[in-house]
Swiss-Prot record:
Protein's organism: Drosophila melanogaster
CDD domains: 7tmA_DmOct-betaAR-like
Designated name of the protein: Octopamine receptor beta-2R
InterPro entries reported in the protein's UniProt record: bZIP, GPCR_Rhodpsn, GPCR_Rhodpsn_7TM
SUPFAM superfamilies: Family A G protein-coupled receptor-like
Compartments where found: Cell membrane
Function: Autoreceptor for octopamine (OA), which is a neurotransmitter, neurohormone, and neuromodulator in invertebrates. Essential for ovulation and fertilization. During ovulation it mediates the OA-induced relaxation of the oviduct visceral muscles, by increasing cAMP levels and activating effectors such as calmodulin-dependent kinase II (CaMKII) and cAMP-dependent protein kinase A (PKA) pathways. Positively regulates synaptic growth; an action that is antagonized by Octbeta1R.
GO molecular function terms listed in the Swiss-Prot or TrEMBL record: DNA-binding transcription factor activity; G protein-coupled amine receptor activity; octopamine receptor activity
UniProt main location, coarse: membrane
Biased composition (Basic residues): 14-26
Membrane topology, record value: Multi-pass membrane protein
Disulfide-bond pairs as recorded: none
Any GO BP annotation: positive regulation of MAPK cascade
């Protein structure tokens, strides 16, 4: 091979010696037909030129930079292609469907939104798909930022887990208390017990799967469980809302139409209402979801192509029907019924106060002659007036106490309705805006917060009972004390107690365990404890 006209072909031995180990670039003397000063370069022993070595190193560095740039460009091109695919699918879904409010899995809708907790290795795309981070970038992260992200992740997981546990334990306490206390076994509390069961199922079937998605950032189960989760979420959330609507109707008949209440709200009618409350959500959740009536053709194709992702997109017809049955119609009924309840409660309270005032004015003049004639037949007059007062006052007091109890129950249930609206209204407002405004985009973190605010309504109902209702508060206290006493007794005093035995027989058997001073004590605290043990 001729390198130059002035130079002959390079000798083979020199051609092999003049190669660098990095880029394998062949070195040769400068051509004499080039610059005049270039031919004065000094040659070291062995035929190796000193200056071309630095030139080869620069070429090697340039080659490495070029390769890195090409690799980065290829990765960015791949990222843009994925982003274009995600945007096209999002545009198709936005034109043909929207996310279902009560059953969607927004944080795991597509792979670009599946973030990894604690900044794990591997590719991690952001929400828009335009950003790219690899293991080298994770190594350059600030340790303080990683520590803060870990703290936020732990706090989020702790709050969600606390909501789940509180919802399960609180509603379970409601069910046990109503079963134990006879005074709470009224028709209204049938709806309350059924509502507590629905809230427990919301915590178990809906919150747990959402908790898994929020913590891990991806769907960890099969596609069948994805559809099952969405169905259960819609089903139990709708059932909980319909229970609140039935409670408002029951209170409406009890206060606004008290004469028709025993005829209208019989056990048969209550059973039909509860049956309808549990059946109608199934027609809205399981049937359309598993048949495929709820979604669009684009989403069905997406599910086939991505079986490991839990995405849930619905068409507008299903969205309008589901939102109306799940929230807007029950909310409208509850608002009208409770407005009528509060109006009637205020009217009855004014009438009772007026009657009580008139009764006091009528009794005051009749009591003066009895005070003046204390001798002779005066005592008989006083006795007669006392008997008349005793005949009329208990009836009025009983009616007044009953009305106050009804009003207190209505106030408690009104607070429950208010918390229900505050918890679910922001979510359904976002849902309505997503239907009407297709260009409006809400961050995934905001949607997740709206979901858990709605879930939090299932946790608040037992707290409202305990704070605003004295009967429930006492029942909760007695139930917790009973559970604690049973736990303490089984742990420290393992006795085989038959609750069907009489208290006297139980005391005779317990003499060998308890001291005589405890059994024969007359202090009030010990009496209360012994009575509590006898009631077991």
């Amino acid at each position: 091979m001729l390198l130059c006209d002035g130079l002959g072909p390079e000798p083979p031995r020199q051609r092999h010696r003049n190669r660098t180990s990095a880029a394998r670039i062949r070195k040769r003397p400068k051509c004499c037909c080039g610059d005049g000063g270039s031919g004065n370069q000094a040659e070291q022993p062995g035929g190796i030129v000193s200056n071309p070595i630095s030139y080869g190193q620069s070429l090697t560095t340039l080659a490495r930079v070029t390769a890195a740039a090409l690799t980065t460009a290829a990765m960015l091109h791949t990222t843009n292609a994925l982003a274009a695919t995600g945007s096209s699918s999002a545009s198709n879904s936005s034109t043909g469907g929207i996310a279902l409010p009560l059953g969607t899995a927004t944080p795991a809708t597509h792979e670009l939104n599946a973030t990894q907790p604690f900044g794990g290795s591997g590719l991690n795309f952001n929400e828009s798909g335009a950003g790219l981070s690899d293991h080298h970038h994770h190594q350059q992260h600030n340790p303080d930022e990683d520590w803060l992200d870990n703290i936020v992740w732990v706090f989020k997981a702790f709050v969600m887990l606390l909501i789940i546990i509180a919802a399960i334990c609180g509603n379970l306490l409601v069910i046990i208390s109503v079963m134990r206390v006879r005074k709470l076994r009224v028709i209204t509390n049938y709806f309350v017990v059924s509502l507590a069961m629905a809230d427990i199922m919301v915590a178990i079937m809906a919150m747990t799967f959402n908790f898994s998605v929020q913590v891990t950032g991806r769907w960890n189960f099969s596609p069948f469980l994805c559809d099952l989760w969405n169905s259960l979420d819609v089903y139990f959330s709708t059932a909980s809302i319909l229970h609140l609507c039935c409670i408002s109707v029951d209170r409406y008949y009890a206060i606004v139409k008290p004469l028709k209440y025993p005829i209208s709200m019989t056990k048969r009618v209550v059973g039909i209402m509860l049956l309808n409350t549990w059946i109608s959500p199934a027609l809205l959740s399981f049937l359309p979801i598993f048949i495929g009536w709820y979604t669009t053709p684009q989403h069905q194709q997406f599910v086939i192509q991505n079986p490991t992702q839990c995405s849930f997109v619905v068409n507008k017809y299903y969205a309008v029907i589901s939102s109306s049955i799940s929230f807007w119609i029950p909310c409208t009924i509850m608002i009208f019924t409770y407005l009528a309840i509060f109006r009637e409660a205020n009217r009855q309270e004014k009438q009772l106060m007026m009657r009580h005032g008139n009764a006091m004015l009528m009794h005051r003049p009749s009591m003066q002659p009895s005070g003046e004639a204390l001798s002779g037949s005066g005592s008989s007059k006083t006795l007669t007036l006392h008997e008349v007062e005793q005949e009329h006052t208990p009836t009025k007091d009983k009616h007044l106490i009953k009305m106050k109890r009804e009003h207190k129950a209505a106030r408690t249930l009104g607070i429950i309705m208010g918390t229900f609206i505050l918890c679910w209204l922001p979510f359904f407002l976002w849902y309505t805006l997503s239907m009407t405004c297709e260009e409006c985009q809400v961050p995934d973190i905001v949607v997740s917060i709206l979901f858990w605010i709605g879930y939090f309504n299932s946790t608040l109902n037992p707290l409202i009972y305990a704070y605003f209702n004295r009967d429930f508060r006492e029942a909760f206290r007695n139930t917790l004390l009973c559970l604690f006493c049973n736990w303490w007794k089984d742990r420290h005093l393992p006795l085989d107690i038959d609750i069907r035995r009489s208290s006297l027989r139980y005391d005779q058997r317990a003499k060998s365990v308890y001291s005589e001073s405890y059994l024969n004590s007359t202090t009030p605290s010990h009496r209360r404890q012994s009575q509590m043990v006898d009631n077991l």
